[in-house]
Amino acid sequence: MRQIEYGPDGGVDSMRIVEAEPPKPGPGEILIEVHYAGINGPDLAQRQGRYPPPPGASPVLGLEVAGRVAELGPSVSQWKVGDWVTALVPGGGYADYCVTSERHALPIPEGLTLAQAAALPEAWFTVWANLIDRAGLKAGERLLIHGGSSGIGLAAIGLARLVGAQPLVTVGNGQKAQFCQDFGAEVAIDYRQEDFVARVKQITHKEGVDVVLDMVGGAYLQKNVSILKRDGRLVLISFLQGSKVEFDFMPVMIKRLTITGSTMRPRTVDEKARIRDELLSQVWPALASGQVKTCLFGIYPLEKVGEAHRIMESSQHIGKLVLQLRE
């Protein structure tokens, strides 16, 4: 089978297609014939040496796929050969075949294409784990989402609307701002044109927001704390501006704030399976009905993986990018 390999320098140009033996599914696992593989920020971070795979995981890039179940491992009961699925995978998605737990696969939502479905798991597992499990986001609350036009950001908008919360977002240009508002954001703030702290305080009449979902880190940490209301929650999922910063904790104590966060890949099979079950019952019907929308920026053949990563690194995209491995 084909799979993507990258060199020790981690450069975009170091990625290349190599031939390898297909993996074998173990107990409770399924082998998926990959038709599409989603591209995510952790893929770029792994290639650059900033997000190594956990012990036992495939070193091949790719954390989500959509395709056909090709083989069943021992004790598999939820799927049969030939079923079409989308799945969160522990690695190995940039390949013709990959293995994952049967409990991390979901059916293709009615009305969605395979390509659209391939772009769902990583973002939706992440936003559910952080906004529902960690932050306890609920109806009537205000949520500020940084990186609102990213795959994670758009999923967070959808989840906020689904639970009855009001999503506000920050983005990098006017086009992204308009897109996010059309997608469901209450307010979209172009951080290059205005101070998001001042704008949030203006919008909320100085009250602040209940939850902030942050993938920026760095200097944003103190700013995020300043716009959280009493008993607010700051959820950290990435650190594009760095994970180390000088920080004043006094506002955290005065406002009784919670600072939390999580990563998805190191979680146990059982933890991911629980999130999968929640998505299947709470989100998948909303995707099928059109209540929750998806956004696919582009589809790239496996040979164009470098081009797709460059687009991701440029942050000029809106929504998700996927690789196509089969027609």
Language-model regions: role of each:
Residues 84, 142, 166, 232-233, ...:
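Short glycine-centered segments of the SAM/dcSAM-binding site in methyltransferase folds
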Residues 118-193:
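Mid-domain Rossmann-like dinucleotide-binding core that forms the NAD(H)/NADP(H) cofactor-binding site
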Residues 21-38, 48-92:
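Glycine-rich beta-strand-centered segment in the early N-terminal region that forms part
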Residues 196-206:
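Short amphipathic alpha-helix with an adjacent loop that forms part of the alpha/beta core around
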Residues 4, 284, 289-298, 306-327:
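C-terminal capping/lid region of NAD(P)-dependent oxidoreductase domains
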